[in-house]
């Protein structure tokens, strides 16, 4: 009788240790920021010139700025990057001249 009691009182322990979770292992999707058109390239109206967070580059002549600071061409022409006020950069679109 004593042996039977001992068998029913047997407690089994886990054979494998519990595995913790890691706080790493995730990343955000790429945002594809930066210049889409370089200096001297031709552009059409509405074409994106520069995608940015904040004003790294400022809009110049014939360039609009979206609510997410994306710079786009208002008219067809040639893209021109220029420095102003020391270290700031602006981008303009110089309209194409028609030779008719």
UniProtKB/Swiss-Prot annotation:
Propeptide: 1-13
GO cellular component: cytosolic large ribosomal subunit
Keyword Methyltransferase carried by entry: no
Gene Ontology terms for molecular function: structural constituent of ribosome
Keywords: Ribonucleoprotein, Ribosomal protein
Annotated region described as Disordered, given as residue ranges: 17-39
Post-translational modification: The N-terminus is cleaved by ribosomal processing cysteine protease Prp.
Family matches, as SUPFAM superfamilies: Ribosomal L27 protein-like
Pfam families the record matches: Ribosomal_L27
GO terms classed as biological process: translation
NCBIfam families in alphabetical order: L27
Family named by the database record: Belongs to the bacterial ribosomal protein bL27 family.
PANTHER family according to UniProt: LARGE RIBOSOMAL SUBUNIT PROTEIN BL27M, RIBOSOMAL PROTEIN L27
Protein's name in the database: Large ribosomal subunit protein bL27
UniProt organism field: Ureaplasma parvum serovar 3 (strain ATCC 700970)
Gene transcribed to yield this protein: rpmA
